[in-house]
Amino acid sequence: MHKKTILAKQLFTGNNCLHNQTLVIEDNRITEIFPSDELITNHTNCYDIVAPAFLDIQIYGAHDKLLAVYPTADTIFPLYDYCSKGGASHFVVTVATNSNAVFRACIDAVKDYWHQGGKGCLGLHVEGPWINSSKKGAHLEQFIHEPSINEVIDLLEYGKGIIKIITLAPEVCSQEIIQYIQSSGIIVSAGHSNATYHEATEAFDNGIETATHLFNAMSPLQHRAPGFVGAIFNHPTVMCSIVPDGYHVDFEAIKIAKKQMGDRLFVITDAVAETTVGPYPHHLVGDRYESNGILSGSALTMLSSVKNLVDKVGIPLEEALRMVSTYPAKAIHRSKSLGSIAI
């Protein structure tokens, strides 16, 4: 049995902030948490802050490789390293609107990564192609379409156990299709949508629990047309991700959203990698990425996201940590195993 002890000046459990705590870890599992009896500042395994590992449910690649362009396990291994260095022990690798062949290749890549013993990857997030072309953002219109039930069945059967999240526009997909996806154990996230306030609210009331990158590629909040954003703000339970880099969303807008949504707002990096290959060439412009002249992804890590939330938005550290761990775990129904520290 491998046993070690960690002392924390501050322990963020996901629910509370505790001071001067001792954690006993046996075989990679926390077995004890108790107040420290000793002065811990000089202890070898003493840390200023101990918090739940972060979770990024929308990230496309790292180190000059996008999964959609290089759909192999060799692309996911360095992505795990990138996420880990930014504090995220787990992630959902993402592929944007593309061909069916690329989706299948990405499914195979995740499967192979698991077979090779790869860590951290929870599965695949398929963003599109069943989205609204008027809110396509950087997605390529040539692949965007309304799906048939047979197309959905074929993709989900091929990706069984691999596909964990699908972002779609609820006004583009029938309720039959949405319910079929959900019945397959896949999280449906609403995004790249031009739905009206009432259409979006109806979709949330009918069971869509999550939306993708607040403010980006969705009908905006206006005083006579509250749109998709207004529906998210007003709904009592729907959660939504946000990209806190100051480019995807102004920091003051994040502050407004946080006041409206509270624990329903969580962080994704939406991070991509620089590449000139494939239909989505990404070029680093300052500290963000553009594809074909359109904002297409961030250069964030989850750790830099926390720093932005605290320094730029004014969110307390304890709450910022929840937004990168506890809340995304809840959004993908993983709260029992991720997003908190407990015995």
Regions found by a protein language model. Give the residues of each.
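Active-site core of metal-dependent hydrolases
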Residues: 157-276
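Conserved, mostly hydrophobic/aromatic
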Residues: 126, 181, 211, 309, ...
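Alpha-helical scaffold segments that flank or form the walls of functional sites
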Residues: 48-51, 57, 67-120, 143-158, ...
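A conserved glycine-rich beta-strand in the N-terminal activation segment of trypsin-fold
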Residues: 17-25
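His/Asp/Glu-enriched, well-ordered alpha-helical/loop segment
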Residues: 231-240, 258-343
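Divalent metal-dependent hydrolysis catalytic cores, especially in the metallo-beta-lactamase
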Residues: 60-64, 77-106, 119-132, 159-173, ...
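Active-site gating loops and adjacent loop-to-helix segments of metal-dependent hydrolytic enzymes
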Residues: 60, 81-92, 132-160, 202-214, ...
